Amino acid sequence: MENGALQQGEGKDPSSFLSEIIGSKVIVKLNNSLVFKGELQSVDGYMNIALEKCEEWVHGKKKTVHGDAFVRGNNVMYISADESA
């Protein structure tokens, strides 16, 4: 941290980051390596996630298109904003 400037992502807690990206495209990676890409509709304190316009990706290839998907929080490895969208 040079000259007191904050670096990208520094100073934010995860819940504030997640509340800021509701309605945005996200990437959700699960503990079993499955990846879901879609529009984040909600997330709760247990990391349970609701996605719309959801796609399931396996080994980098789109496998299935889902309308809505609900992911149980204990299966989530990470949630990331989808910069490619």
From Swiss-Prot:
Compartment(s) of residence: Cytoplasm; Nucleus
Disulfide bonds: none
Protein transport keyword on record: no
Predominant location category: cytoplasm
SMART domains, A to Z: Sm
Keyword RNA-binding listed: yes
Domain Sm: 13-85
A Gene Ontology term for the protein's cellular component: U6 snRNP
Gene Ontology terms: biological process: deadenylation-dependent decapping of nuclear-transcribed mRNA; maturation of SSU-rRNA; mRNA splicing, via spliceosome; tRNA processing
Gene Ontology MF terms: RNA binding
Alphabetical UniProt keywords: Cytoplasm, mRNA processing, mRNA splicing, Nucleus, Ribonucleoprotein, RNA-binding, rRNA processing, Spliceosome, tRNA processing
InterPro entries for the chain: Lsm6/sSmF (IPR016487), LSM_dom_sf (IPR010920), Sm (IPR047575), Sm_dom_euk/arc (IPR001163)
UniProt-listed PANTHER family: SMALL NUCLEAR RIBONUCLEOPROTEIN F SNRNP-F, U6 SNRNA-ASSOCIATED SM-LIKE PROTEIN LSM6
Family: Belongs to the snRNP Sm proteins family. SmF/LSm6 subfamily.
Function as written in the Swiss-Prot or TrEMBL entry: Component of LSm protein complexes, which are involved in RNA processing and may function in a chaperone-like manner, facilitating the efficient association of RNA processing factors with their substrates. Component of the cytoplasmic LSM1-LSM7 complex, which is thought to be involved in mRNA degradation by activating the decapping step in the 5'-to-3' mRNA decay pathway. Component of the nuclear LSM2-LSM8 complex, which is involved in splicing of nuclear mRNAs.
Subunit annotation: Component of the heptameric LSM1-LSM7 complex, which consists of lsm1, lsm2, lsm3, lsm4, lsm5, lsm6 and lsm7. Component of the heptameric LSM2-LSM8 complex, which consists of lsm2, lsm3, lsm4, lsm5, lsm6, lsm7 and lsm8. The LSm subunits form a seven-membered ring structure with a doughnut shape.
Protein name: U6 snRNA-associated Sm-like protein LSm6
